Amino acid sequence: MRLILGDQLNASHSWFKDKDPNTLYLIAELRQETDYVVHHVQKVCAFFAGMQQFAQALDSAGFKVLHLTLDDTQAFSDLPQLLAHLIQQHQVQCFEYQLPDEYRLRQQLAQLCAQLSISSQSVSSEHFYLTDEELPRYFSQGKKHRMEAFYRKMRQRFAILMDDEGQPEGGQWNFDANNRNKLKAADLPGVPQPLLFTNDVSEILKRLEKHQIKTLGQAESSLLWPVNRQQAKELLDYFCHFCLPFFGTFQDAMTGQLKQQGNNRQWSLYHSRLSFALNSKIISPQLVVNTVLAHYRKQQEQLLCAKPRIDLAQVEGFIRQILGWREFVRGVYWLNMPEYASLNALAANRDLPSWFWTGQTKMKCMQQAIEQSLEFAYAHHIQRLMITGNFCLLTGINPDQVDAWYLGIYIDALEWVEMPNTRGMSQFADGGIVGSKAYAASGNYINKMSDYCGTCHYKVAKTTEKEACPPVSFLVPARHFHFSFCFGQILANKQASRVNNITRQITISRWHDIA
């Protein structure tokens, strides 16, 4: 019996090179996975729909598949109990599984296998650029690593965007300085409509209601996210043709104007929205990177007459996210778990405000980011890092609560990728393992990269007045703070000085640009 987890929907895995009538593939919906954190309802639907379609695809290809829904697994408290039952029921002689990408599941399965009386084996998921065995060559427990150095090594090793002399294509490694543009009014008409799918998940929603699965966010019987390989490849192709030409230019931009105009494109902009398909392994990072590169090369060779032309900065910015950040945070996660999950370098201990689950706040930037997340189970990286994450950092929210919120609300959130991004990059709770500084910013940065501030109840230019940006009087009675004032509180916090003299390390993101 071979176990396939919900984030292991990899049709290219070597398991599927040959068919064996004596091998049973198990795909199962479990309360254990719906309940370890409160998930967005679209996230649960997407994983369950993806699992169902993968099971059907395997069955159609001639593999022996057992697909169990919540109706079938409700009697089992956890995965080991279900597996033990099925091993006995089907008289299984050997149990195999792909190594989970989450510490919790990897420990759980290792403990189960240690108790089994039959043979067992774990194999690679065959998804990432770096195997598990290779990670210690790039990462060490507790050591502070820098993504840029790692990214350059990855570019060199896999010969991606490198010239014949072993130098970075275009003469530089990073074009991030070119990718900080705000969407002006004249840019808005050109923002593409997002490619949306119409996957019927009404039966899954009925199951969630029947089993009283607690979720958050807006439920939709027609799921817009890709849940099979064909849809994921279609979305990738759409990205290359319609989003890639301006991906880098506007990757940090935010706008609420499109929604006000009755055209709901502001949540997707030029982003690929491939993260769910990638993190569920419906498609591979190699396929994504190679497809983007092939599209870029064809245009360079004038085999494609697409307009506007795609320049190197757009391609490099996108590949950096896949080859760089995605592989980087995975390495940080595995070389630092389980200790990483409890790090709290800034001793942050405040509770997450209740309006994080409703979006009912007068702060326009927070309202936009949270309402969008509740509606689509998605926000792009700057909304996560510099809006909601920035707020939590500056106001000292407990990183455990921040982790749980991010892990639950986003469709692409799995612990291996969420935790280093949230606890590390966003909250600096790891004391600098992921980032060299805390990514804190004032309202001026938000005003520079968005059009939120112009229609906000609060005034970005104010400091300590009642209408200052933003008020956090729920934390400190009768006081009103703006982002920069909160930042100053971090610098003055004596608790922070106990961690590598953190007060000297924290800097406002792009201070010279926004001062």
Regions found by a protein language model. Give the residues of each.
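N-terminal beta-strand-loop-alpha-helix module at the start
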Residues: 1-70
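Substrate/cofactor-recognition hotspot
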Residues: 1-15, 41, 169-299, 309-311, ...
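C-terminal catalytic domain of photolyase/cryptochrome flavoproteins
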Residues: 5, 10, 253-256, 265, ...
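Gly/Ser/Thr-rich loops at beta-strand to alpha-helix junctions
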Residues: 8-10, 74, 99-107, 393
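A short acidic (Asp/Glu
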Residues: 13-16, 36-39, 77-80, 105-110, ...
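Glycine-rich phosphate-binding "P-loop"
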Residues: 63-77, 355-358
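Acidic carboxylate-rich catalytic motifs and surrounding loops in phosphoryl-/glycosyl-chemistry enzymes
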Residues: 67-73, 123-127, 250-252
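Beta-rich, aromatic/charged-enriched effector core domains that present basic-aromatic interfaces
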Residues: 78-225
